[in-house]
């Protein structure tokens, strides 16, 4: 049986996601660190998988630490391209160029 997530935690994560500027990406771990849960990047992924039930958030701007896209989010690439984010030959976001500098 899976644990039910506290709505306040969900909104805390989603509010950080909402701060990611257009044309940039953040990693799951980066979001986790920003909310004080540095070792809970999977929690961030879990929340993002349910984000549509909480409102309209730019979840397409969150990738893994190597710039890989979410495997079950086919429109993620198109949305990032539309914002000017370029991809390396291996299909990953160039994290050196497009990683959001959040000050963390």
PLM features per residue range, with description:
Residues 2-104:
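Nucleic acid-binding interface residues in structured DNA/RNA-binding domains
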């Amino acid at each position: 049986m899976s644990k039910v997530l506290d709505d306040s935690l969900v909104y805390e994560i989603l509010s950080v996601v909402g701060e990611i500027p257009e044309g940039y990406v953040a990693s799951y771990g980066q979001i986790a660190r920003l909310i004080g849960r540095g070792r809970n990047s999977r929690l961030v992924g879990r929340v993002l998988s349910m984000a549509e039930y909480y409102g309209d958030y730019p979840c397409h701007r969150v990738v893994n630490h190597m710039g890989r896209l979410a495997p079950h989010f086919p429109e993620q690439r198109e949305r990032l391209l539309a914002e000017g984010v370029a991809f390396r030959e291996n299909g990953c976001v160039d994290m050196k160029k497009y990683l959001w500098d959040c000050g963390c």
